[in-house]
């Protein structure tokens, strides 16, 4: 699922942004759309890979597979969604067509689809079934439609293929309800030129609010960008605004990684590649905890079910995340003002604001007795832009009679989780050392998480 080679790496974009701080006023003026704000609040989604590859022990289909191999005799989208819901994910993106060109809906554009499979005598619709089941379980639904098509001969003619691809997109965008996200993956496309402007125009005709995932090569059209690696980690300070050819735009990061190491599709006898719970928790800390969206790859097997081991791991993952963040110690603070309480109430719909026009501020939290904690979770209110450029979490050192830093970084963004060795204090503060405009803090939370002192740097 690597993106087009002409797309600029995300790390490069971060560097470009850092270089643009000399124009901090422009940076602070860039704001997200309401759709981007709502999407970032989802935080965690799942992308589903299921196609002829599933039945042939393949990762990269070449378009030669006979549709007759596709026959998931125990297909149960409700079982998929139950497992995904248990993980804590909020949305699902289905790979409706991967690079092999096989379509999971009864498209009118090609016979290379489930219409020619034995499943349901060619009368089934995986996309429709998955969309309905996702919404049944409270999950938002989106689709991935690969531009690269290794089966259809029209791919050799850019004009003919654009017409074909746009017709497929029109079917998906007009028949399956609201789409939370549309994934553009350019893997394998090489020098092929697509009419991306028309692709986005077609999508927007039917889905004006869909979040388009792409990368900076589609800067004019994409709403979110690739992290630059399939590790599911954000290895850099995460800024939502990036500079592309002198233009600043709000482009939050989505970080994709498969549940089974290196495999997006299911393969038999491959349970050993299932990621451990600890690895998934570290991934969460370094994606969601670094202000990015986590997109976890889940692969149904050739029965049409999420494998039991994968479903169990997803459930464990969801339970562990919920347990970790069940006891917010900041709720035990001594109340001082309604303004301060807005960042300490556990309600992300309220926020504390630094003094108007300020570039430095502190949010101090006092407790009736010392608390011990090893994790701080901070969220910016981003509707007016990402303003914090440098911050620190500090405790009052009674013996030294001064504030002591226990964590520091630059970006906060949607959510920043800082971890450190356990400390004990009755006074804690968030020190906004530099901001392009007054800081807005949705949440400042503190936790003691056993066995998690080193999961995120």
Short names for language-model regions:
Residues 24-359, 364-372, 377-379, 383-387, ...:
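Mature catalytic domains of secreted/periplasmic carbohydrate-active enzymes
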Residues 1-11:
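Bacterial N-terminal signal peptides that target proteins for export
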Residues 9-19:
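Bacterial N-terminal signal peptides
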């Amino acid at each position: 699922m690597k993106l087009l080679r002409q797309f600029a790496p995300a790390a490069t974009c971060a560097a470009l942004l850092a270089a643009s701080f000399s124009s901090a006023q422009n940076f602070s003026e860039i704001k997200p759309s309401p759709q981007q704000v709502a999407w970032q609040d989802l935080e965690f989604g799942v992308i589903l890979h299921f196609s002829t590859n599933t039945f042939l022990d393949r990762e990269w289909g070449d378009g030669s597979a006979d549709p007759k191999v596709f026959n998931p005799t125990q297909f149960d989208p409700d079982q998929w969604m139950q497992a995904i819901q248990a993980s804590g994910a909020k949305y699902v993106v289905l790979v409706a067509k991967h690079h092999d060109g096989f379509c999971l809906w009864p498209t009118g554009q090609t016979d290379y689809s489930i219409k020619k499979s034995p499943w349901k005598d060619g009368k089934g619709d995986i996309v429709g079934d998955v969309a309905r089941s996702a919404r049944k379980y409270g999950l938002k639904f989106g689709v991935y439609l690969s531009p690269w098509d290794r089966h259809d001969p029209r791919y050799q003619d850019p004009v003919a293929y654009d017409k074909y691809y746009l017709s497929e997109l029109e079917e998906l965008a007009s028949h399956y309800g609201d789409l939370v996200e549309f994934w553009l993956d350019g893997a394998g496309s090489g020098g092929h030129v697509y009419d991306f402007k028309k692709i986005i125009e077609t999508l927007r005709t039917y889905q004006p609010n869909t979040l388009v995932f792409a990368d900076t090569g589609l800067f004019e059209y994409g709403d979110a960008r690739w992290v630059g690696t399939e590790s599911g980690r954000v290895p850099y300070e995460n800024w939502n605004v990036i500079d592309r050819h002198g233009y600043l735009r709000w482009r939050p990061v989505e970080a994709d990684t498969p549940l089974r190491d290196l495999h997006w599709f299911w393969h038999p006898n491959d349970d050993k590649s299932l990621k451990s719970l600890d690895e998934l928790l570290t991934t969460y800390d370094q994606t969601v905890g670094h202000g990015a969206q986590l997109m976890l790859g889940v692969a149904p097997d050739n029965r049409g079910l999420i494998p039991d081991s994968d479903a169990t791991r997803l459930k464990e993952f969801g339970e562990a995340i919920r347990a970790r963040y069940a006891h917010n110690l900041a709720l035990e603070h001594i109340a001082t003002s309604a303004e301060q309480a807005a960042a300490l109430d556990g309600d992300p719909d309220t926020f504390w604001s630094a003094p108007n026009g300020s570039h430095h501020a502190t949010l101090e939290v006092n407790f009736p007795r010392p608390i011990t904690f090893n994790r701080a979770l901070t969220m910016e209110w981003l509707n007016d832009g990402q303003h914090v450029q440098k911050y620190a979490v500090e405790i009052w050192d009674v013996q030294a009679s001064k504030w002591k830093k226990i964590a520091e970084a630059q970006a906060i963004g949607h959510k920043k989780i800082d971890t450190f060795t356990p400390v004990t204090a009755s006074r804690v503060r968030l020190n906004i050392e530099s901001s392009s405009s007054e800081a807005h803090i949705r949440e400042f939370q503190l936790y003691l998480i056993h066995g998690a002192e080193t999961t995120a740097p």
